[in-house]
């Protein structure tokens, strides 16, 4: 399954059962949790024009588009939620790159506490990256995704740097005969670029993994523990979350 868990025919199952496929770390909910305030409305019949100009009704559209979950909040109150057979309020569902925003939120907490300084260089926290694309870049560059690197985020890649990244992070199987040194070893070899840091935005998933590494190094605990402590507990989270790990225990942020 590790070779095809993101393929359309099994993705809806695997997105709800990732902990059976990959190493993960639990992130504790609040104790006690806080219940959502609600002002529920039935929005199934809400109509809108889709990208083709055709009129759709929300409930039918969510089912036809193979959505798993959908929620509407207004003024801090839950107005509407919708679940397919692959979603439920207490079911853990992968959120992919939403984790990047969550990691930045956690970094903001540590910045506010004086633990992380956005003006310092990344290598002040992670000297291991001194010979990678991250050399000379600041934490501000990292948070803004303005790191100059030769990494290409190519989701169709089958044998290049992006596939190597997926294998290093345990999202794809290691080929027979290949060596797996893990995600953080991959980050130490991040390909460099002739461009200067801070000159353009470059969306690059490994940057968030570097941020997760800085968070662990500066925060003195695992990403999962720090996220539980500083985000899930204060916001009153009702259910446990998790984050996937590589085979060495590094979080895939």
Regions found by a protein language model. Name each.
Residues 96, 201-203:
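Catalytic tyrosine of NAD(P)H-dependent dehydrogenase/reductases that use a Tyr as the general acid/base
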Residues 197-200, 252-253:
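Active-site rim elements
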Residues 76, 94-118, 142, 211-215:
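Active-site SXXK
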Residues 89-93:
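Loop-to-helix entry region of an early transmembrane alpha helix in multi-pass inner-membrane enzymes
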Residues 60-61, 81, 105, 109, ...:
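Residue-level signal for well-ordered alpha-helical scaffold segments within enzymatic catalytic domains
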Residues 94, 112-155, 189-192, 206, ...:
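Active-site helix/loop module of the DD-peptidase/beta-lactamase fold
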Residues 1-88, 113-116, 144, 148-150, ...:
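N-terminal leader/targeting segments and the immediately adjacent pre-domain N-terminus
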Residues 77-82, 121-124, 158-196, 222-240:
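Short, charged, amphipathic alpha-helices and their helix-cap/turn boundaries
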């Amino acid at each position: 399954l590790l070779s095809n868990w993101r393929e359309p025919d099994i993705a809806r199952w695997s997105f709800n059962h990732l902990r059976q496929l990959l190493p993960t770390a639990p992130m504790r909910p609040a104790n006690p949790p806080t219940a959502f305030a609600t002002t529920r409305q039935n929005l199934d019949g809400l109509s809108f024009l889709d990208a083709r100009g055709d009129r759709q009704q929300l409930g039918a559209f969510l089912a036809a588009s193979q959505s798993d979950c959908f929620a509407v909040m207004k003024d801090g109150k839950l107005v509407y939620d919708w679940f397919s057979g692959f979603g439920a309020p207490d079911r853990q569902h992968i959120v992919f790159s939403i984790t990047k925003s969550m990691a930045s939120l956690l970094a903001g907490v540590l910045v506010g506490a004086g633990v992380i300084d956005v003006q310092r260089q990344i290598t002040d926290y992670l000297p291991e990256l001194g010979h990678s694309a991250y050399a000379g870049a600041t934490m501000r560059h990292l948070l803004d995704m303005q790191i100059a690197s030769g990494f290409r985020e190519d989701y169709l890649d089958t044998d290049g740097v992006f596939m190597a990244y997926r294998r290093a992070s345990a999202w794809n199987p290691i080929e027979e005969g290949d060596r797996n040194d893990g995600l953080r070893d991959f980050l130490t070899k991040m390909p460099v670029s002739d461009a200067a840091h801070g000159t353009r935005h470059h969306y690059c998933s490994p940057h968030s993994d570097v941020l997760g590494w800085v968070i662990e190094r500066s925060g003195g605990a695992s990403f999962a523990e720090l996220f539980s402590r500083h985000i899930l507990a204060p916001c009153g989270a009702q259910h446990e979350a998790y984050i996937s790990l590589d085979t060495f225990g590094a979080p895939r942020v």
